[in-house]
């Protein structure tokens, strides 16, 4: 099995080259779609722009929501990935609900 070439995507999921990806990647403010602090937890949703789906038949997963426990040096306690900005925004809101209800531990 060979290595798959890295695939880059813009905010709308359209393929782009690495130069365009670097342009979109910095500064972080333009790729961060959600950031909330809830008690000792931080919920963050960002555009990655790289396909993190390791299933060759699946959709590119280019957005990510993570929950961090800031009382433990920002240790991540949950991670979900999405194909679209809409899924990521909805997932961010769902993660906020999970943290508020302390359901994040069941990811």
Residue ranges of model-derived segments:
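Short intrinsically disordered terminal tails
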Residues: 1, 100-107
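Short, ordered coil/turn segments that flank beta-strands lining enzyme active or ligand-binding pockets
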Residues: 11, 70, 86
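Short aromatic-glycine-(Arg/Gly/Cys) micro-motifs in beta-strand/loop hairpins
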Residues: 48-78, 94, 101
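A short, charged, amphipathic alpha-helix used as a generic interaction element across diverse proteins
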Residues: 83-101
């Amino acid at each position: 099995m060979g290595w798959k070439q890295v695939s880059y995507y813009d905010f709308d999921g359209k393929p782009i080259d690495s130069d365009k990806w670097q342009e979109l990647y910095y500064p972080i403010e333009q790729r961060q779609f959600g950031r909330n602090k809830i008690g000792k937890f931080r919920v963050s949703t960002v555009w990655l722009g790289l396909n993190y789906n390791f299933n060759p038949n699946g959709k590119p997963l280019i957005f990510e929501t993570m929950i961090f426990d800031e009382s433990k040096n920002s240790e991540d306690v949950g991670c979900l990935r999405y194909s679209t900005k809409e899924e990521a925004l909805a997932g961010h809101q769902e993660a906020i609900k999970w943290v508020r209800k302390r359901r994040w531990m069941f990811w």
